[in-house]
């Protein structure tokens, strides 16, 4: 159970990604199994594959029942196709916990009060190393004088281990650098019990060691509540007891199953395997000559078809032309040629950088000063009203979805979140938000869909019609005068009642006067002229307002003598 962790979501049910995390694939109608046991209240939701995690978002309670798994904790995956009533499943196998415990124990012993003293066989200088210096110690200690790595066979006779440590020494050197839990991406020193960086969200190198240590201390996240099905739990316990009695030496590998109810899950499993391969490649990219096949034409493999490699580097014969003064002159010419190429490339890149800097400076100077002050004021207000920093958003690309229904659901959630964030100051008790679907369509496509593909007006309407079905109740799609579609924060009758009361307080107001009153009540009012005209026309048709047509214009009065509801 320690592999599951809580996932933060938005009000519309979309996961909040970490810094640098990117979404890869999305699937719907997925259930969770821990081992062979069904996890209750997690049997219908969406599954997100990102570059760092596998995220489950529950359809019923997305803010409470959402869970996540770290890709670093997975060893490999196995796909199981469906048969009869059994749905297709993706089995996620975790890494061996015994190896993690050994890593944690080795880290604890390395940070213990043990100092190994050894003499360098090259320069005969005495060195000190934290922890016990054995044959399996990695990385190999390096001499502080000559910089040559120590050979255990040559230095084992001079190794001396002791528990004495200088009390005046720096505590960071006593407990090692790993105890500070430093992030390799932003170099921020995190708390030792945190698995992801607090600043950038990067996965910390000793996250597995931290979790194994917390498990030994019985630490549990109070936000994660996992309840397994009783029948499957009893069967799982009996199978585990039979397995342990049959093989006392072996330990069962923990695994998690993703059950796909609507799709076959093949694309999701392939994307997961590719993501695990990318993580492994990213970790091993700094290793030089890993799995080398040949050195200077000499095959390093033991067999022609085997995957075993020789540890001994073959002897390379030197030619006479590679030694002497001629060889030195040739190497000097090659060095000058390489330096010339390097400097030319550097100058080319510098010229490109300078041209880009001048264009940016020109764009900055041509910008309007008033717009700059407005943006600064908006930023100050956002910092006061929103203490939390903005998290990376999902990139809703059509190619990541299996069908159009799932794509429209995610688009509806994004439109809902975008509308609330843009007009959150207008959604109050004194000023209701109302905007035409045409204006919202233009704003959404210009702000959110450039670079990922614009949506059509029909898709925009279908997405807004899904608000009520998805449980997004703060916005509603209404039709004014049977022809104008608008998105409002309240029912249309409430909006009409507000406008009628406003005209009752200011009788004889024309269209310009009403616009000025609404703007004076709230400087950020989104009552456009078109919306106001449509609402007034609807009130006149329903008999709530009376009009007085004159040469100077049309004046509106509240119908207090012949109300329409009588």
Swiss-Prot record:
A GO CC annotation given for this chain: late endosome membrane
Start and end of every GLUE C-terminal domain?
255-288
User: InterPro entries, alphabetically?
Assistant: GLUE_dom, PH-like_dom_sf, Snf8/Vps36, Vps36, Vps36-NZF-N, WH-like_DNA-bd_sf, WH_DNA-bd_sf, Znf_RanBP2
Q: Give the record's keywords alphabetically.
A: Cytoplasm, Endosome, Membrane, Metal-binding, Protein transport, Repeat, Transport, Zinc, Zinc-finger
Signal peptide bounds:
none
MF-aspect GO terms: phosphatidylinositol-3-phosphate binding; ubiquitin binding; zinc ion binding
What start-end ranges are recorded for coiled-coil regions in this protein? Answer: none
Q: Where is the GLUE N-terminal domain?
A: 7-96
User: What Gene3D superfamilies does the annotation carry?
Assistant: Pleckstrin-homology domain (PH domain)/Phosphotyrosine-binding domain (PTB), Winged helix-like DNA-binding domain superfamily/Winged helix DNA-binding domain
Q: What is its main location?
A: cytoplasm
Question: Looking at the Swiss-Prot or TrEMBL record, what is one Pfam family this protein matches?
Answer: EAP30
A single GO BP term for this record reads: ubiquitin-dependent protein catabolic process via the multivesicular body sorting pathway
Q: Where are the zinc fingers (RanBP2-type)?
A: 114-151, 177-205
On assembly, the entry states:
Component of the endosomal sorting required for transport complex II (ESCRT-II), which consists of 2 copies of VPS25, 1 copy of SNF8, and 1 copy of VPS36. The ESCRT-II complex interacts directly with the VPS20 subunit of the ESCRT-III complex. Binds ubiquitin.
Family as reported in the entry's similarity comment:
Belongs to the VPS36 family.
Q: Domain annotation text?
A: The second RanBP2-type zinc-finger is functional and binds ubiquitin.
Q: What else is known?
A: Present with 2470 molecules/cell in log phase SD medium.
What is the role of this chain? Component of the ESCRT-II complex, which is required for multivesicular body (MVB) formation and sorting of endosomal cargo proteins into MVBs. The MVB pathway mediates delivery of transmembrane proteins into the lumen of the lysosome for degradation. The ESCRT-II complex is probably involved in the recruitment of the ESCRT-III complex. Involved in the trafficking of the plasma membrane ATPase. Its ability to bind ubiquitin plays a central role in endosomal sorting of ubiquitinated cargo proteins by the ESCRT complexes.
| Identification of the protein by name | Vacuolar protein-sorting-associated protein 36
Q: Which organism is it from?
A: Saccharomyces cerevisiae (strain ATCC 204508 / S288c) (Baker's yeast)
User: Which lineage do the record's taxonomy fields give for this organism?
Assistant: Eukaryota, Fungi, Dikarya, Ascomycota, Saccharomycotina
Gene name linked to the record: VPS36
